[in-house]
């Protein structure tokens, strides 16, 4: 098991949720943390809770903009001289039936979730290879098994998994660790910010957030997976059972998933 002390770690989507909790977790373990998000002022306010000033860098970055991703990597190398770990966490969800959906919503989800991961990874890769480091894609159980009313979300998470699984094989002999990290349901703002059929945030969550895994627990699991240089991590018993059922009893899982979503508050099936 490796130590994260003095490792240079970039976290996208670091202004809230799993990204912020992960930045704090890495900082508590002595890492040098680069926080990347669109909410620059918010990151500046949060940075003291992550690490001392000399060990944290905030970079305004919209991962849908290729030049922003390129600048993020350049700023990191200029400040710390290397990159050991890239955590592709920035993401957006949705909740609407495909038949009702404005296609711009799918484009947004693919731009943020998939292309954001691809673009940041592309520019960080030479430094990660040099450091024999790790690249992480924070996906979802929806990246293993379909989730109704989240066509674009599932598609983007499946795409990230396919991209990173392929990248792992391409660099199997180069010392690069590629981790596909699937948290399952985690308490965060992602459901309130989820896009509806016309692209506006739904502003509420259909789940009881207090009953879900906390972002802090999720961040601890991510840290452990990185220190162990894992290639795959699926969190929660429900998450692991869902993935197993998808592989063994796909038709049964389809029916179970339908019933599960139909019971949600404000279910799109109602």
Regions found by a protein language model. Give the residues of each.
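The beta1-alpha1 cofactor-binding region of Rossmann-like NAD(H)/NADP(H)-dependent oxidoreductases
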Residues: 60-71, 103
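Residue(s) in the substrate-gating loop at a strand-loop-helix junction
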Residues: 140
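Substrate-binding pocket helix/loop in short-chain dehydrogenase/reductase
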Residues: 97-98, 102-107
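Conserved glycine-rich cofactor-binding loop
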Residues: 8, 15-16
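SDR active-site lid
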Residues: 173-237
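Conserved glycine-rich Rossmann-like NAD(P)H-binding loop of the short-chain dehydrogenase/reductase
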Residues: 29-46
């Amino acid at each position: 098991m490796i130590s994260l002390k003095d490792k240079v770690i970039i976290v996208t989507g670091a202004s809230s949720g799993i990204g912020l909790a992960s930045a704090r977790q890495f900082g508590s373990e002595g890492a040098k943390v680069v926080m990347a998000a669109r909410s620059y002022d918010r990151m500046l306010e949060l940075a003291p809770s992550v690490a001392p000033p000399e060990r944290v860098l905030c970079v305004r970055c919209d991962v849908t903009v290729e030049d922003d991703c390129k600048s993020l990597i350049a700023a990191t190398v200029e400040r710390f001289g290397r990159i050991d770990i890239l955590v592709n966490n920035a993401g957006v969800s949705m909740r609407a039936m495909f038949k009702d959906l404005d296609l711009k919503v799918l484009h947004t989800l693919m731009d943020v979730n998939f292309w954001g991961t691809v673009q940041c990874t592309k520019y960080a890769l030479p430094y990660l290879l040099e450091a024999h480091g790790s690249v992480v894609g924070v996906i979802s159980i929806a990246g293993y098994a379909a989730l109704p009313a989240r066509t674009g979300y599932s598609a983007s998470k499946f795409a990230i998994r396919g991209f990173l699984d392929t990248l792992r094989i391409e660099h199997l002999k180069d010392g690069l660790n590629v981790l596909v990290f699937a948290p399952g349901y985690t308490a965060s703002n992602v459901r309130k910010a989820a896009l509806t059929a016309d692209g506006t945030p739904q502003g509420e969550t259909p789940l009881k957030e207090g009953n879900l895994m906390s972002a802090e627990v999720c961040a601890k699991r991510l840290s452990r997976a990185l220190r162990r240089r894992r290639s795959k991590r699926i969190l929660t018993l429900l998450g692991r059972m869902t993935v197993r059922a998808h592989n063994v009893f796909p038709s049964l899982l389809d029916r179970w998933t339908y019933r599960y979503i139909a019971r949600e508050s404000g279910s799109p099936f109602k």
